[in-house]
């Protein structure tokens, strides 16, 4: 397996880049977040890679960090998520944002990614729960461990993900679930 490539970036044509390594040009599919972070053509780059060998093709996927590659590998294990969809997820959400969405069970955030419908988002949340290390970036803002319960209650009441998140940010430190819901509803009514 090819785990990492270092060479000269010779071409960028989204979502593919071409990296020259000692005279051999490797075409590598990358998420848009990685593509935007790459330097101009002619510069030296290092990409962490994942090789997929199929009957009709050998495909190389590249990432700016090993954490991003690990997340990609976890995503493609989810039923209904292929490599293209996993790239779309990583193009739309950083690893920290994805981890937070999984921890807080935010289907709304995932369904904004092209190719992810409600059922796929729910399956992804179910199958990925607890698989992204220490759930990077998912530390609850104000409501301690009750934040996801409060968020789910607000979403069940018909409030959007954006409205619910804004209300959660206004909650005081360490509030319990029932008090948190009451305060969040009060903030949303204003």
UniProtKB/Swiss-Prot annotation:
GO BP annotation list: DNA recombination; DNA repair
Single annotated GO MF: ATP binding
Taxonomy, superkingdom: Bacteria
Compartments (UniProt record): Cytoplasm
UniProt entry tagged with the keyword Transcription regulation: no
Region named Domain III: 142-190
Region listing for Domain I, in residue ranges: 1-64
First-listed, main subcellular location of the protein, grouped into a coarse class: cytoplasm
Record region (Flexible linker): 137-141
GO CC list: cytoplasm; Holliday junction helicase complex; Holliday junction resolvase complex
Domain II as annotated region, ranges: 65-137
Keywords, alphabetical: Cytoplasm, DNA damage, DNA recombination, DNA repair, DNA-binding
Disulfides per UniProt: none
Name of one Pfam family that matches: RuvA_N
Assembly information from the UniProt record: Homotetramer. Forms an RuvA(8)-RuvB(12)-Holliday junction (HJ) complex. HJ DNA is sandwiched between 2 RuvA tetramers; dsDNA enters through RuvA and exits via RuvB. An RuvB hexamer assembles on each DNA strand where it exits the tetramer. Each RuvB hexamer is contacted by two RuvA subunits (via domain III) on 2 adjacent RuvB subunits; this complex drives branch migration. In the full resolvosome a probable DNA-RuvA(4)-RuvB(12)-RuvC(2) complex forms which resolves the HJ.
Function: The RuvA-RuvB-RuvC complex processes Holliday junction (HJ) DNA during genetic recombination and DNA repair, while the RuvA-RuvB complex plays an important role in the rescue of blocked DNA replication forks via replication fork reversal (RFR). RuvA specifically binds to HJ cruciform DNA, conferring on it an open structure. The RuvB hexamer acts as an ATP-dependent pump, pulling dsDNA into and through the RuvAB complex. HJ branch migration allows RuvC to scan DNA until it finds its consensus sequence, where it cleaves and resolves the cruciform DNA.
Domain remark in the UniProt entry: Has three domains with a flexible linker between the domains II and III and assumes an 'L' shape. Domain III is highly mobile and contacts RuvB.
Family, similarity comment: Belongs to the RuvA family.
Matching NCBIfam families: ruvA
Protein name (database record): Holliday junction branch migration complex subunit RuvA
Organism annotation: Bordetella parapertussis (strain 12822 / ATCC BAA-587 / NCTC 13253)
């Amino acid at each position: 397996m090819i785990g990492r490539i270092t060479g000269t970036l010779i071409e960028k044509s989204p979502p593919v880049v071409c990296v020259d390594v000692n005279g051999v040009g490797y075409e590598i599919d990358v998420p848009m977040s990685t593509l935007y972070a790459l330097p101009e053509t002619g510069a030296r780059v290092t990409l962490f890679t994942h090789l997929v060998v199929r009957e009709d093709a050998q495909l190389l996927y590249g990432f700016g960090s090993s954490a991003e590659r690990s997340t990609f590998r976890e995503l493609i294990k989810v039923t209904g998520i292929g490599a293209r969809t996993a790239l779309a997820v990583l193009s739309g959400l950083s690893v920290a944002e994805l981890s937070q969405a999984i921890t807080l069970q935010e289907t709304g955030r995932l369904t904004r990614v092209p190719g992810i419908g409600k059922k796929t988002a729910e399956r992804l949340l179910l199958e990925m729960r607890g698989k992204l290390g220490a759930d990077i970036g998912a530390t609850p803002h104000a409501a301690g461990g009750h934040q996801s319960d409060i968020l789910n209650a607000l979403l069940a009441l018909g409030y959007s993900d954006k409205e619910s998140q804004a209300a959660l940010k206004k909650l005081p430190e360490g509030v319990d679930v029932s008090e948190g819901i009451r305060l969040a509803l009060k903030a949303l009514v204003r």
